[in-house]
UniProtKB/Swiss-Prot annotation:
Homodimers and heterodimers. It is found in: Nucleus. InterPro entries: AUX/IAA_dom, AUX_IAA, PB1-like. Belongs to the Aux/IAA family. Residues 86-173 form the PB1 domain. It comes from Arabidopsis thaliana (Mouse-ear cress). GO terms for molecular function: DNA-binding transcription factor activity. GO terms for biological process: auxin-activated signaling pathway; regulation of DNA-templated transcription; response to auxin. GO terms for cellular component: nucleus. Aux/IAA proteins are short-lived transcriptional factors that function as repressors of early auxin response genes at low auxin concentrations. Repression is thought to result from the interaction with auxin response factors (ARFs), proteins that bind to the auxin-responsive promoter element (AuxRE). Formation of heterodimers with ARF proteins may alter their ability to modulate early auxin response genes expression. A motif (EAR-like (transcriptional repression)) lies at residues 21-25. Keywords: Auxin signaling pathway, Nucleus, Repressor, Transcription, Transcription regulation. PANTHER family: AUXIN-RESPONSIVE PROTEIN IAA15 (PTHR31734:SF34), AUXIN-RESPONSIVE PROTEIN IAA17 (PTHR31734). This is Auxin-responsive protein IAA15.
């Protein structure tokens, strides 16, 4: 047998469009007049610059702003969390193996904060307030400010305390004598 006998000629051998691999979805008509699309080519400078000047350009800008405002899930969740005025600080109790969190934004004054702390550690402690001349309480409330200094709760005005407090510590009265 000669090699020509093994070669078959298909009836539509001139048109290989049916077997051509493309990136189009199956059943999508392809336009042969467009030719193969080239991806990955660099654009020329004039193709990147929008030369629409004047009012038509402003209208396109305004319409694009409207569509951005209608996006689902906008603004991002992280941005929305920043706008919420929450000021959580950790409260450590000397001798306890656990910490608690307190939202300072819920309270308007030191009295409310001390009441909440006593209720939080109910039956365990009594907190001495700075205004008391005799330190009758078992614990003294201290806090660490932005600079890392340990200060007594009640030494500064309430709003300044809320802004500067990083964490709170309920110290035994004997340990807080030098503060």
């Amino acid at each position: 047998m000669s090699p020509e006998e093994y070669v078959r000629v298909w009836p539509d051998s001139g048109d290989l469009g049916g077997t051509e691999l493309t990136l189009a979805l199956p059943g999508t008509p392809t336009n042969a007049s467009e030719g193969p699309k080239k991806f990955g080519n660099k654009r020329r400078f004039l193709e990147t610059v929008d030369l629409k000047l004047g009012e038509a350009h402003e209208n396109n800008y305004i319409s694009s702003m409207v569509t951005n405002d209608q996006l689902v899930g906008w603004p991002p969740v992280a941005t929305a969390r920043k706008t919420v005025r929450r000021k959580y600080v950790k409260v450590a109790l000397d001798g306890a193996a656990y910490l608690r969190k307190v939202d300072l934004g819920m309270y308007d004054c030191y009295g409310q904060l001390f009441t909440a702390l006593e209720n939080m550690f109910q039956g365990i402690i009594t907190i001495c307030r700075v205004t008391e001349l005799e330190r009758k309480g078992e614990f003294v409330a201290t806090y660490e400010d932005k600079d890392g200094d340990l200060m007594l709760v009640g030494d500064v005005p309430w709003m300044m305390f809320v802004e500067s407090c990083k964490r709170m510590r309920l110290m035994k009265t004997g340990d807080a004598i030098g503060l």
